[in-house]
Amino acid sequence: MSSSRKQARLDAKSNIESLSVQPYPNSKKIYIDGSRPDIRVPMREISLADSLVGGTKENPTLIPNEPIQVYDTSGVYTDPNYDIDVYQGLPKLRERWIEDRTDTEMLKGVSSVYSQERLSDETLDELRYGNLPTIRRAKKGQCVTQLHYARQGIITPEMEYIAIRENMGRQKFADEQLNHQHPGHSFGANLPKEITPEFVRNEVAEGRAIIPANINHPEAEPMIIGRNFLIKVNANIGNSSVSSSIEEEVEKLVWSTRWGGDTVMDLSTGRNIHETREWILRNSPVPIGTVPMYQALEKVNGVAENLNWEVMRDTLIEQAEQGVDYFTIHAGLLLRYVPMTAKRVTGIVSRGGSIIAKWCLAHHQESFLYTHFREICEICAKYDVSLSLGDGLRPGSIADANDEAQFAELRTLGELTKVAWEYDVQVIIEGPGHVPMHMIKENMDEQLKHCHEAPFYTLGPLTTDIAPGYDHITSGIGAAMIGWYGCAMLCYVTPKEHLGLPNKEDVKIGLITYKLAAHAGDLAKGHPGAQIRDNALSKARFEFRWEDQFNLSLDPITAREFHDETLPQESGKVAHFCSMCGPKFCSMKISQEVREYAKDTEQVALDQAINIKMLDDPLEGMRQKSAEFKASGSELYHPAVDAEPVKS
């Protein structure tokens, strides 16, 4: 290991060992209670300063602003009442709910052969997570998926939790200005003003939404993915053969949840994948997804042709028993689709897709993922692992967008969706990729048509190929658009896309970009309450409440840093201008003065008198305004609260 890599690992180890609660500025963790004592739904509440509405500097008239509640994915990492210890893991939030259903059993040990081998290897003791939980599995003849419960008409605690979470406490806002919202264009999405537990249950039962919630990941806070809910964002982390360590990946996990990652995928392809994943799961408040194929390939020393169902089956069980909430499975890539990619500019760019394509050609038969798909569903049903049906033939360049190969695979994914639903296994569909703006909607339309309204989950799409280093932007454009059209979850892209493994700062930039895209999509759809935060920030901006502007933003730290680069003094936090326009050309400051001016009845009466005089002498009004300006000291701008009409 190089000295720089060793130092990065040591720094990460130090960081996770000394993790302390780091709340957002002027925010606090609150909990909204449900129907039972153990349903406590976290929100982040942002406190706001009062609005100045009149008076003088010495005796101002103030009106309080209600705090704003926002969706929170950070778990206990922002709860000051919790002592963080990554060696003990997170509280098992859902453990009691799972026990109460009495349809699971505790296993005496791990079922996977590979897991048994890892546990018996003493050389891994230093790496291994020490507080391993007891494994659960469905009792014989039982199905433990949220889809199964929903179809039985059962509203689970998870569903109630989600209903509270999706509403974000917006019912309490009475302020007409905050509640103002433009009508959206939902493209057929059903967006009720209030999300109820029954609505959640019905959406899951119909297959339009999933609750990724493995019974072996009770630490995860329940969330939902579906086009009739808030658009979600996934963050990818994971080591490679040349970069990163367990400590760095745990650090990136915590970092991802802080900046709004609704789910996290561990895409590790390097050493110690099993141990890395255990550390991540035990410390993750959000659902964790994987691509099991990556680890299966490592087990056969990276030779795709040597993969087989036995290795894959053992890997699925291994990961399900650890607690992985959803698997990406590239089962829709069929042998006959591979030649369709021959004339592509960029061929097959999906790692999982290329592995399967190579295996299919080497054996000249359909992949074991396709031929054993029903067995995959049986495994998932025992642990409530959701399936994310992977798009192994997604376009890797805009030249290849919406081609025959891509849509042929999509239709097969729709067929597999119906098979998974036979086993009450939850399903989402993965999508592209690289697609120019004018071709994006066709992807959403085709997915809804062929995949029976199962939730769509896309990587971007990237709308142009000319910006390596800025692909978080090229893809953020496409993500906002497809989110508006109905995509349920967006997989983030970082500035390092196509260039290298992202570091912490890249993860943050990718997440902020995609939270922005998701929010823009929610606004465009007309999701109820989506505009409240925008309205609160705009009001703060107009009133020059700088701290509130920072704190209401997606990234308060960067917003404050940018402001302070040019106005670092504390006086800059109360100034009625910023460095963009300066004190004399601030449009909002001038607008405030105009508003105050218009409010003054004496001034209105005076102007009316001037207007009458102007009928007799058009220059009289000009002369009077000139006199007013000189009498006020010939100053172009005055503080809005001090402005007094000059009497002639």
Curated annotation (Swiss-Prot):
Keyword Iron: yes
Binding residue positions for substrate: 236, 265, 294, 330, 350-352, 391-394, 430, 457
GO cellular component: cytosol
Enzyme class: lyase
GO molecular function terms listed in the Swiss-Prot or TrEMBL record: 4 iron, 4 sulfur cluster binding; carbon-carbon lyase activity; zinc ion binding
EC number: 4.1.99.17
Protein function: Catalyzes the synthesis of the hydroxymethylpyrimidine phosphate (HMP-P) moiety of thiamine from aminoimidazole ribotide (AIR) in a radical S-adenosyl-L-methionine (SAM)-dependent reaction.
Protein name, UniProt field: Phosphomethylpyrimidine synthase
Source organism phylogeny: Bacteria, Pseudomonadati, Pseudomonadota, Gammaproteobacteria, Vibrionales
